[in-house]
């Protein structure tokens, strides 16, 4: 608006007032509060969408939000969907080319306040890579404000058993005219501890062997990510981003192995003790870079063209030593039974990726198509020094993988009530390599076709039906391609396989949603060439060979249900449950070494409580339970977990305090395998009670140009 203007005039005839210049008047509002409620869960054509601000209001980071997202499992190894498998992770529709601890560290750097949605695409369009046998997880960030500079800083402290861990993340965002920029810096300490106890019984030999291991580790990590976008015109923009994530760690394992004879009375007679200690140091780093170009068309809003070029580099080095002594039950050393090794393994991976995507409107629908190429080289080295019990060894394998892809997606409404989306993706994979200078002749090149289908029927606003099907794959990690022996102790040797193929999964699902809050899904699927660790035990020597192989074949049929309730102002809850039958066989080609079939049920509850009318004081509690199931050939015992959290927001939303606890309810996971020759079971303890305290302070202000300043306004009013 403008300031009031007053002028006293004496009118004695015609009068020309000339130009009347009014002075602009601005009034800065301290805060504007808009009260409303978005649904916490929304099912769209090909995805389930969760409101990130509501699903985990007490969370501190994107990682904490994913921990509390129904159906999502977060571990040190990455992100997966419970009962369905691994996913690829996107941020704002762009793939995050990190995995393992580097991915976990990156997700820690995003504060919860920056997140808008968590999207789970179990039937993603053909545009997305066929990897991720359970689909795609897309994290949508809030859009940058126009003419704004600001960010956030978030210190966090975590207490896990006797370890106090810390982290500090900071974010800066800038948007002015044609320039958008962001910078993320984060670092801290990570730590873990637990126990893994395994027990092997050989009935025919009458022997029993136990191996009980306690482990702990800790180390620093750091991550940096920077992005810059420039809009040449409203329809043409170009940008680039880089990230760098180094990490170090030191760990220690204390192992107590024992050999027994099973007497006729079923009692165990101790024959030998083999106490051992291992110290490990590892360091790794991810480096990524991206350049992208995006073009839209004013004459056709749905038409778009985009180009991306990426580089991904990974370096990993692990130093390990292990020493054990053989002792009689009375503690007397056993000559020739000592075992020792000093080993160094490293992995170098470089990937270069480029893609071109185009979308064209066709009537009420759209046609998308594109091409992509990926060129990757991986080098794995394994070295054991001369003092090792197995002798001096030096091995090197180089593996090249080239993937070329073409895809087409078509989306069109068939009527006011029917919608169709279908797609086809073709990927050609060429592989080559050398093992210690010898060319790998048995590697194969192959062509895969991946169809996708979605058919939706919405008779009215209350009901929605869907039918969708897809075929997806899961490529092996490059570390799984190393065939060299990796000793844990004298009884356990792990290996990869140089000619591992991608695992494939086909899935068909029928869904129904009522009022956007009650959802049912009936699905069936088949996994073949599944990549798993095949365990073979020698009953005579008790030596176990654990090898990555395309050895899993699994049929799955399930019924899934979810319900969202928010009919009262102080409470909301999301309930998800699934009942499925699986038939799993583990064994190369047509053989079956072990596995099993049976029903499994899981249920998860995510509850949010609002303790005041403004909803600035909130609490959450979550619960998860799963009955015994089969996974990777193991029969796994039941799983129970639960957590709770509190958050309080003040200073008009700028300061946020959060306290949450994971594994308030928890149990150790028990696994077992039974074959005609042996039985092995394990007890895995790694779910310790963890307390997190986080503080997030957000800052920022509009960027005012000279024409916006009051002094400039007053001067202009005088001209």
Predicted regions mapped to residue ranges:
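N-terminal periplasmic accessory domains that precede
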Residues: 18-21, 62-65, 103-106, 120, ...
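Face-selective signature of the C-terminal outer-membrane beta-barrel domain
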Residues: 225-247, 278-435, 458-462, 516-522, ...
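Outer-membrane beta-barrel signature, preferentially recognizing the C-terminal barrel domain
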Residues: 345, 398-399, 473-521, 526, ...
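Short, acidic, small-residue-rich periplasmic hinge/interaction motif at the N-terminus
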Residues: 3, 12-56, 74-76, 82-86, ...
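Short acidic/polar hinge/loop motifs at secondary-structure boundaries
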Residues: 62, 95-122
């Amino acid at each position: 608006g403008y300031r009031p203007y007053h002028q006293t005039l004496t009118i004695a005839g015609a009068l020309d007032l000339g130009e009347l210049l009014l002075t602009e008047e601005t009034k800065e509002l301290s805060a504007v509060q808009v009260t409303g409620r978005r649904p916490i869960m929304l099912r769209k054509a090909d995805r389930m969408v969760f409101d990130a601000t509501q699903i985990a209001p007490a969370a501190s980071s994107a990682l904490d939000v994913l921990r509390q997202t129904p159906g999502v499992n977060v571990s040190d190894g990455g992100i997966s969907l419970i009962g369905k498998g691994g996913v690829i992770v996107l941020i704002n529709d762009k793939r995050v080319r990190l995995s393992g601890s580097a991915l976990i560290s990156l997700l820690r750097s995003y504060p919860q306040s920056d997140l808008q949605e968590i999207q789970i695409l179990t039937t993603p369009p053909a545009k997305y890579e066929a990897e991720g046998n359970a689909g795609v997880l897309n994290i949508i960030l809030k859009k940058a404000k126009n003419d704004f500079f600001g960010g956030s800083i978030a210190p966090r402290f975590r207490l896990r058993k006797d370890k106090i861990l810390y982290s500090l993340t900071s974010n800066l965002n800038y948007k002015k005219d044609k320039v958008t920029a962001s910078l993320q810096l984060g670092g801290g300490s990570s730590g873990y501890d637990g126990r893994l106890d395994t027990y092997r019984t050989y009935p025919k030999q009458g022997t029993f062997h136990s191996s009980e291991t306690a482990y702990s580790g800790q180390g620093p990590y750091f991550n940096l990510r920077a992005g810059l976008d420039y809009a040449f015109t409203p329809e043409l923009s170009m940008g680039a981003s880089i990230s760098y994530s180094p990490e170090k760690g030191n760990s220690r394992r204390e192992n107590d192995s024992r050999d027994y004879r099973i007497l006729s009375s079923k009692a165990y007679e101790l024959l030998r003790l083999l106490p051992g200690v291992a110290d490990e140091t590892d360091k790794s780093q991810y480096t990524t870079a991206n350049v992208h170009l995006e073009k839209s068309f004013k004459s056709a809003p749905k038409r778009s063209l985009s180009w991306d070029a990426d580089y991904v580099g990974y370096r990993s080095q692990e130093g390990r030593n292990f020493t054990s002594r053989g002792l009689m039950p009375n503690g007397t050393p056993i000559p020739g039974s000592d075992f020792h090794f000093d080993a160094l393994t490293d992995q170098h991976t470089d990937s270069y990726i480029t893609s071109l995507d185009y979308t064209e409107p066709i009537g009420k629908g759209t046609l998308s198509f594109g091409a992509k190429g990926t060129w990757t080289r991986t080098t794995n080295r394994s070295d054991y020094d001369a003092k090792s019990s197995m002798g001096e060894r030096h091995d090197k394998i180089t593996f090249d993988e080239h993937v070329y892809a073409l895809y087409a997606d078509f989306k069109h409404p068939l009527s006011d009530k029917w919608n169709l989306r279908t797609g086809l993706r073709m990927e050609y994979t060429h592989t080559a390599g050398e093992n210690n200078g010898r060319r790998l002749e048995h590697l194969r090149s192959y062509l895969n076709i991946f169809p996708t289908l979605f058919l939706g029927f919405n008779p009215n606003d209350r009901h929605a039906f869907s039918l969708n099907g897809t075929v997806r794959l899961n490529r092996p990690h490059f570390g799984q391609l190393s065939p060299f022996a990796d000793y844990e102790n004298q009884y356990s040797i792990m290996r990869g396989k140089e000619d591992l193929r991608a695992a494939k999964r086909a899935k068909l699902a029928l869904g129904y949603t009522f009022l956007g809050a009650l959802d049912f899904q009936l699905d069936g699927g088949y996994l073949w060439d599944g990549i798993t660790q095949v365990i073979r035990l020698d009953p005579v020597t008790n030596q176990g060979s654990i090898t990555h192989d395309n050895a899993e074949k699994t049929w799955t049929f399930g019924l899934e249900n979810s319900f969202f309730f928010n009919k009262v102002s102080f409470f909301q809850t999301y309930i998800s449950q699934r009942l499925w039958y699986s038939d799993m066989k583990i064994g190369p080609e047509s053989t079956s070494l072990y596995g099993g079939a049976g029903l499994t049920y899981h249920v998860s509850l995510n509850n949010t409580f609002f303790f005041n009318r403004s909803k600035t004081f909130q609490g959450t509690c979550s619960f998860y339970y799963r009955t015994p199931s089969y996974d990777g050939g193991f029969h796994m015992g039941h799983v129970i977990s639960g957590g709770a959290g509190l958050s309080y927001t003040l200073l008009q939303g700028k300061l946020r305090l959060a306290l949450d606890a994971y594994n308030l309810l928890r149990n150790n996971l028990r696994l077992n395998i039974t074959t005609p020759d042996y039985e092995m079971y394990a007890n895995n303890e790694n779910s310790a009670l963890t307390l997190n305290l986080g503080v997030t302070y957000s800052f920022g202000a509009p960027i005012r140009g000279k024409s916006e300043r009051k002094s400039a306004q007053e001067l202009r009013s005088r001209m």
